[in-house]
Amino acid sequence: PVTVVAEEKGADLKQRIARNFGCPQPEGYRKSLRLMQQAEKFGRPIVCLVDTQGAFCGMEAEERGQGNAIADNLVAMASLTVPVVCIVLGEGGSGGALALAMGNRVAMQDHAVYSVLSPEGFASILWKDRTRAAEAAAVMKMSAREACDMGIIEEVVSEGDGPAHENPEQAAAYVEEFVTRSLRELYRLSPEELRDQRYERFRAF
């Protein structure tokens, strides 16, 4: 048995509205925390599928403790003694992504991005000019290859022949291979080694 925690945006407008465009509320992070604590209790490995532009940042989310919910996830994931494998599918934005990406192995799909905010937001803050988004993206180094080169992730996972949304079954097969292989490798470590390896991994950057 494996515990799977996933952020989902939806495939069309109706689904995206129902899923809050993939921006989790505090309750979503608390639900994921309960699942991870349950996995720890029963010794189940955890697989996190990350796809979000970031945690929902509305006033109501802040009033319900969005920052605390993200911080609680990070603290809990740092102390888990079961294998944790994470993969960014499409987009990993800010703390909303990091709250489910503190794993022993972290990967990104080939066309995915991982950053603290959008290039448009970066450009508007740094240069007061959203039209410089392409320049901002280059500075931010948010692509999968760049994240791998910097040691933020271990692996870039192929999406097959073209982007994942055009051939989801092929892309899913590559994700399955990465997750399965990573879990096999991590099962060789003791619970204490898993926790320590995860801590050292994130302290490195």
State what each model feature region is.
Residues 44, 50-180, 184, 188:
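Conserved catalytic cores of soluble enzyme domains
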Residues 1-2, 6-9, 21, 165, ...:
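Intrinsically disordered, low-complexity segments enriched in small/flexible residues
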Residues 21, 29, 42, 56, ...:
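Aromatic side chains
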Residues 18, 53, 111, 196-199:
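Generic intrinsically disordered, low-complexity segments enriched for polar/acidic and small residues
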Residues 1-49, 67-72:
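Glycine-rich beta-alpha loop segments
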